[in-house]
UniProtKB/Swiss-Prot annotation:
Pathway: Purine metabolism; AMP biosynthesis via salvage pathway; AMP from adenine: step 1/1. Gene3D superfamilies: 3.40.50.2020. Its EC number is 2.4.2.7. InterPro entries: Ade_phspho_trans, PRibTrfase_dom, PRTase-like, UPRTase/APRTase. Keywords: Cytoplasm, Glycosyltransferase, Purine salvage, Transferase. GO terms for molecular function: adenine binding; adenine phosphoribosyltransferase activity; AMP binding. The gene is apt. This is Adenine phosphoribosyltransferase. Catalyzes a salvage reaction resulting in the formation of AMP, that is energically less costly than de novo synthesis. The keyword Cytoplasm applies. Pfam families: Pribosyltran. GO terms for biological process: adenine salvage; AMP salvage; purine ribonucleoside salvage.
């Protein structure tokens, strides 16, 4: 007599992980690109993802969700809406129409700059920063510095994916930024 294995309980993080596509050698040879678009295309996986973030932050007494350009603009506004909070876009330089403050950071080959409006938040506001993934941590670190320069308290950085082999999560935690990620992948 054969026995079917007992059904395992639903694991949201495992499910999210299974919905992320790996594209080898993109955008260059040796890179394993973690593509979140399949996750976003399915209502169930998008709902599971947003629900994970909502559960994490519903009782945190936040004032804003800040999203990093560009894929943080996908999850960030949805999360802000679900939590009844405002959304702060942290943009690449030259994309915001009002007066801004900016922060430059190093990339693997060169540097980049992000900025926010100078009135994006006020001293004492509690903010979570969201993005699709944490690689080197440079963009999230720059966003943290910008928000803190305006007097906000960044309570946590959040991402769907952590790529710990690239050192970003270690860098951010070392700088005092707690992190929440749904899943992680080794390699580059």
């Amino acid at each position: 007599m054969s026995h079917a294995p007992a059904n395992r309980p639903f694991d949201p993080a495992e499910y999210i992980n299974s919905e992320i596509r790996t594209v080898p050698d993109w955008p260059q040879a040796g890179v394993q690109f973690r593509d979140i678009t399949p996750l976003l295309q399915k209502p169930k996986s998008l709902r599971v993802l947003i629900d994970l973030f909502v559960q994490r932050y519903i009782d945190q007494k936040l004032d804003y969700v800040a999203g990093l350009d560009a894929r943080g603009f996908i999850i960030g506004p949805i999360l802000a809406y679900e939590l009844n909070l405002g959304f702060i876009p942290i943009r690449k330089i030259g994309k915001l129409p009002f007066r801004t403050v900016s922060e430059s950071y190093e990339l693997e080959y060169g540097s980049a700059t992000v900025e926010i409006h100078e009135d994006a938040c006020k001293p004492g506001d509690r903010v979570v920063i969201v993005d699709d993934l944490i690689a080197t941590g440079g963009t999230m670190m720059a966003g943290k510095k910008l928000l803190e320069r305006l007097g906000a308290t960044v309570i946590e950085g959040a991402a769907i994916v952590d790529l710990p082999d690239l050192g970003g999560s270690k860098l951010l935690r070392g700088a005092g930024l707690p992190l929440f990620t749904v899943t992680s992948f080794g390699g580059h």
